[in-house]
Amino acid sequence: MHIAIIGAAGMVGRKLTQRLVKDGALGGKPIEKFTLIDVFQPEAPAGFSGAVDARAADMSAPGEAEQLVEVRPDVIFHLAAIVSGEAELDFDKGYRINLDGTRYLFDAIRLAHGKDGYKPRVVFTSSIAVFGAPLPYPIPDEFHTTPLTSYGTQKAICELLLSDYSRR
């Protein structure tokens, strides 16, 4: 199995990579290759004997999503994002990274699927920020999104995009 992790140099990306290396498999299938991407150079995981392509790349840059999709990972973990505070301070950067980068990835997958049926499993990390406040506990699946920040809005839009692209 070939696994790609976008946002691999971040805390969650590093922990996910370590856990996958420790487990050695995902869904009962052995992991043979990692493609690790982040705007900062990700480190190759210690203790992994398979192939690793670790590279610095900005998924909101033209062509980057297509390059990832060309290597046909079986599973793509999309963890990359500009967090709430930074997305509020730099409106354009928040939308470029959080929305455009995600849309480029989904569109590259859609186009590849149209060519040869490529259909990876995509795991997208959202945020509690999509719900706004106040929140019930626990938050039920059908709870409506009412984001109060640009970051929450961007994540909510990406959830809708994922749902729409998944139908295609």
Segments (PLM) and residue ranges:
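Conserved glycine-rich Rossmann-like NAD(P)H-binding loop of the short-chain dehydrogenase/reductase
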Residues: A25-E43
